[in-house]
């Protein structure tokens, strides 16, 4: 999710404010009964509104605990599994795909989880408007759209500007964890993050970390394994 550098000019010669290029496409999708239940019953309890000032998440969760935010949780399987496995931590998921939000919330209701909240809007807006600086222990970005074609690379969410936004929101020592099943995108993310100031690559060899135990195996990973693809994990720690 990066900014366009083209500034449109109006007919009277004045420059219009440029629009930010989004890294996602809104997809229509039918709701299952369970997904609709999640939205109807879980939405009022667990979907957070987009705020105009930093949110006090200690108040939202009723405690102070290590906090993880995931961007683009898809259908929510991994986030649900991680939240259930770590009840002593708090999790915030951001996803614009409504069936995915419904599926996650249905799981939250079914499992009775209390340590998970959701935003159903643009993650950049959430980070800019709702998340205080130096407040996150971890930010996760698993299997983002790689935008394969060269002309679409500007739509990739991992850009220097985004890396700086994430760095501001992480606590010192906080970790930005990325994963992809497309090697050219892994190489691209490694290049961007290696050039981003204020980070340290946690990989011993300066490339990719071994598959972390805390990241559940996703459908993307299983698909990649069937196709003979690998999965690349990157972990960059905020150092200042």
UniProtKB/Swiss-Prot annotation:
Residues 1-20 are annotated as: Disordered. Pathway: tRNA modification; N(7)-methylguanine-tRNA biosynthesis. Gene3D superfamilies: Vaccinia Virus protein VP39. SUPFAM superfamilies: S-adenosyl-L-methionine-dependent methyltransferases. It comes from Pseudomonas putida (strain ATCC 700007 / DSM 6899 / JCM 31910 / BCRC 17059 / LMG 24140 / F1). Its EC number is 2.1.1.33. It holds the Pfam family Methyltransf_4. The keyword Transcription does not apply. InterPro entries: SAM-dependent_MTases_sf, tRNA_(Gua-N-7)_MeTrfase_Trmb, tRNA_methyltr_TrmB_bact. Belongs to the class I-like SAM-binding methyltransferase superfamily. TrmB family. The keyword S-adenosyl-L-methionine applies. GO terms for cellular component: tRNA methyltransferase complex. The active site is at 145. Substrate binds at residues 149, 181, 218-221. PANTHER family: 3-DEOXY-D-MANNO-OCTULOSONIC-ACID TRANSFERASE/TRNA GUANINE-N 7 - -METHYLTRANSFERASE, PENTACOTRIPEPTIDE-REPEAT REGION OF PRORP DOMAIN-CONTAINING PROTEIN. GO terms for molecular function: tRNA (guanine(46)-N7)-methyltransferase activity. It is an enzyme of class 2 (transferase). S-adenosyl-L-methionine binds at residues 70, 95, 122, 145. Catalyzes the formation of N(7)-methylguanine at position 46 (m7G46) in tRNA. It catalyses: guanosine(46) in tRNA + S-adenosyl-L-methionine = N(7)-methylguanosine(46) in tRNA + S-adenosyl-L-homocysteine. This is tRNA (guanine-N(7)-)-methyltransferase. Keywords: Methyltransferase, S-adenosyl-L-methionine, Transferase, tRNA processing.
């Amino acid at each position: 999710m990066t900014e366009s550098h083209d500034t449109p000019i109006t007919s009277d010669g004045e420059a219009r404010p440029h629009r930010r290029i989004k890294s996602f496409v809104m997809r229509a999708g039918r709701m299952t009964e369970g997904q609709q239940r999640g939205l109807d019953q879980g939405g009022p309890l667990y979907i957070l509104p987009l705020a105009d000032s930093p949110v006090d998440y200690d108040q939202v969760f009723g405690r102070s605990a290590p906090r993880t935010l995931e961007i683009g949780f898809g259908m929510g399987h991994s986030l649900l599994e991680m939240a259930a496995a770590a009840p002593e931590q708090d999790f915030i998921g951001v996803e614009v795909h409504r069936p995915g939000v419904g599926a996650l919330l249905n799981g939250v209701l079914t499992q009775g989880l209390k340590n998970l909240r959701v935003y159903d809007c643009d993650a950049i807006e959430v980070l800019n408007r709702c998340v205080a600086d130096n407040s996150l222990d971890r930010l996760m970005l698993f299997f983002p759209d790689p935008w394969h074609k060269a002309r679409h690379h500007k739509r990739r969410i991992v850009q220097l500007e985004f890396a700086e936004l994430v760095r501001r929101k992480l606590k010192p020592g906080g970790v930005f964890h990325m994963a992809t099943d497309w090697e050219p995108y892994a190489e691209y993310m490694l290049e961007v993050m290696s050039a981003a100031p204020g980070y340290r690559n946690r990989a011993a060899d300066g490339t990719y970390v071994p598959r972390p135990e805390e990241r559940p195996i996703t459908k993307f990973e299983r698909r990649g394994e069937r196709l003979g693809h690998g999965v690349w994990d990157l972990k960059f720690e905020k150092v200042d």
